[in-house]
């Protein structure tokens, strides 16, 4: 440790935390923030202020700095880049020593990186765009309880995406009618049905009753079709104790999968539930309710790719990822980027998809992306092309809104999916020839034909709010 002397007072952050000569270590946690500084604040000072407040710094010099090796523990702002197309914003790259973070704790990482610093007066807006978790830290986290391959092995389903349906209306059904809808969808050809994010235990349908009627429907559909079926039973609850109580009851009924709202319930609850699922042989479906509060503003908050990485570390076998083509926000290239971060063992830097760093996941299993929100049979070719096999396509209204009923809606989706997969396997450009592929399949499926007629005019063509930053400064790294 270098010899130091204490000098009281306030000094510029950049004198301590701006280190452009620094070369990040393999064990450093790296972060990139999009910053708009207050008028008159130099960019280096704003970047250094973020590095300080998210690591060891405070607003004034303190004598207790002499009791530790501040030069080792501090965050270091080591690079600044302009944001293409925006003269006010810039990217600040910051390196943090791994010892700043508790092992296996996404909670602790986020408390540092997006804690007090987001209320800092020196910046007008601040967004955490990406994180590089070093492999040494990844190995301290539990990750997905099962992963994609183990899920396929348990379900005995290979070579195609999985199909699901969110039961609608999301609120107001009795447990018995809810279970009836589940049964009709599963016997019609779906692999899964799902509780919506805000179904917990309301007066119109208490959780015990829902679990019992739903699992009766699941077992009946499994017996009749000879296929393994499941329903995402939402165990999100007011307290962790109640959450585990619901999970245990789901297990006692023979449920293969449960569900959790990871952002509203919190990462502590989610990591604990993921550990429980790993120990009890249960799949864990993760809903991202509340994510857009954090990630939709392109100038302030946390990008969804960061939330995706944090969820993979915390634990979950499924995660809602957006659809690109449905009713919810999602740029195509950015979506493909975070889908890769969910599934792949190694993802290289690729600025064209918004990925700022290489990310090595080691042997950690992948998370299956769930495409859900305003999709129907006409979207099936695009979904197949965008997501490939290791995904779950979830049609709520696109199943339950079929004029002939739930089973017919499920059957139409299954026929459409298998037609697209077969065409893809034959080498046909599925997205470009989607209309022809579906029309050919509909000749042998009246359910699909009616579904195509019902939703032929339904499109969600709105401009994307959170677009990738593009321009002459964009660096593209081919995967």
Curated annotation (Swiss-Prot):
Give the free-text miscellaneous remark of the entry.
The basic functional RuBisCO is composed of a large chain homodimer in a 'head-to-tail' conformation. In form I RuBisCO this homodimer is arranged in a barrel-like tetramer with the small subunits forming a tetrameric 'cap' on each end of the 'barrel'.
Return the HAMAP family for the record. RuBisCO_L_type1
Which residues does the record give as substrate binding sites? 116, 166, 170, 288, 320, 372
What is an example of a Pfam family matching this protein? Answer: RuBisCO_large_N
Cofactor note from UniProt?
Binds 1 Mg(2+) ion per subunit.
Instruction: Tell me the cofactors it needs.
Output: Mg(2+)
**Site residues (Transition state stabilizer), renumbered to this chain:** 327
Q: How does this polypeptide assemble, per the annotation?
A: Heterohexadecamer of 8 large chains and 8 small chains.
Please report the name of this protein according to its UniProt entry: Ribulose bisphosphate carboxylase large chain 2
Q: Function, please?
A: RuBisCO catalyzes two reactions: the carboxylation of D-ribulose 1,5-bisphosphate, the primary event in carbon dioxide fixation, as well as the oxidative fragmentation of the pentose substrate. Both reactions occur simultaneously and in competition at the same active site.
Q: Extract the NCBIfam families matched here.
A: PRK04208.1 (NF003252)
**What are the GO MF terms of this UniProt record?**
magnesium ion binding; monooxygenase activity; ribulose-bisphosphate carboxylase activity
Superkingdom as given in the UniProt entry: Bacteria
User: Kind of enzyme, top EC level?
Assistant: lyase
Q: Which reaction does it catalyse?
A: 2 (2R)-3-phosphoglycerate + 2 H(+) = D-ribulose 1,5-bisphosphate + CO2 + H2O; D-ribulose 1,5-bisphosphate + O2 = 2-phosphoglycolate + (2R)-3-phosphoglycerate + 2 H(+)
Q: Which residues carry this modification: N6-carboxylysine?
A: 194
**Into which family does the record put it?**
Belongs to the RuBisCO large chain family. Type I subfamily.
Which UniProt keywords are listed?
Calvin cycle, Carbon dioxide fixation, Lyase, Magnesium, Metal-binding, Monooxygenase, Oxidoreductase, Photosynthesis
Coiled-coil regions listed: none
Its EC number is 4.1.1.39
């Amino acid at each position: 440790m270098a010899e130091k002397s204490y000098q009281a007072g306030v000094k510029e952050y950049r004198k301590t935390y701006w280190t452009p000569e620094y070369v990040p270590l393999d064990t450093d946690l790296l972060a990139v923030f999009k910053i708009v500084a207050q008028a008159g604040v130099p960019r280096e000072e704003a970047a250094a202020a973020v590095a300080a407040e998210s690591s060891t710094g405070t607003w004034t010099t303190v004598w207790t700095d002499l009791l530790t090796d501040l030069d080792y523990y501090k965050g270091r702002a080591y690079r600044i880049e302009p944001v293409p197309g925006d003269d006010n914003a810039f990217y600040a790259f910051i390196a943090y020593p791994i010892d700043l973070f508790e092992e296996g704790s996404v909670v602790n990482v986020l408390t540092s990186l997006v804690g007090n610093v987001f209320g800092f007066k020196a910046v007008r807006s601040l967004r955490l765009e990406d994180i590089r978790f070093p492999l040494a830290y990844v190995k301290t986290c539990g990750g997905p309880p099962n992963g994609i391959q183990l899920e396929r092995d348990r379900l005995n389903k290979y070579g195609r995406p999985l199909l699901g349906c969110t039961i609608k209306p999301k609120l107001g059904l009795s447990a018995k009618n809810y279970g009836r809808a589940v049964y009709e969808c599963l016997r019609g050809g779906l692999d899964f049905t799902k509780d919506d994010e805000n179904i917990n235990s309301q007066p119109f349908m208490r959780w015990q009753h829902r679990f019992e009627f739903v699992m009766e429907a699941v077992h009946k559909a499994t017996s009749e079709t000879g296929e393994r079926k499941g329903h995402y039973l939402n165990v999100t609850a007011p307290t962790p104790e109640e959450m585990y109580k619901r999970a245990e009851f789901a297990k006692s009924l023979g449920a293969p999968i449960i569900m959790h709202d990871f952002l509203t319930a919190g990462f502590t609850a989610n990591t604990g539930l993921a550990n429980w699922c790993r120990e009890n042989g249960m799949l864990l479906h993760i809903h991202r309710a509340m994510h857009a509060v954090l990630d939709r503003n392109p100038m302030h908050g946390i990008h969804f790719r960061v939330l995706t990485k944090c969820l993979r570390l915390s634990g979950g076998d499924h995660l809602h990822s957006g659809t690109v083509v449905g009713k919810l926000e999602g740029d195509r290239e950015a979506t493909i980027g975070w889908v890769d971060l969910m599934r792949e063992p190694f993802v290289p830097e690729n600025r064209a998809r918004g990925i700022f760093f290489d990310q090595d996941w080691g042997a950690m299993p992948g998370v299956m992306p769930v495409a859900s929100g305003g999709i129907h049979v006409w979207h099936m070719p695009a979904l197949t092309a965008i997501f490939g096999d290791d995904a779950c396509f979830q049609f709520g209204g696109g199943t339950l809104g079929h004029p002939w009923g739930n089973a017919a809606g499920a059957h139409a989706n299954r026929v459409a999916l298998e037609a697209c997969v077969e065409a893809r396997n034959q080498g046909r450009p599925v997205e470009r020839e989607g209309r022809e592929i579906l029309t050919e399949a509909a000749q042998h499926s009246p359910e699909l034909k009616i579904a195509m007629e019902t939703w032929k005019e339904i499109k969600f063509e709105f401009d994307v709010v959170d677009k990738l930053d593009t321009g002459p400064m964009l660096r593209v790294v081919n995967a």
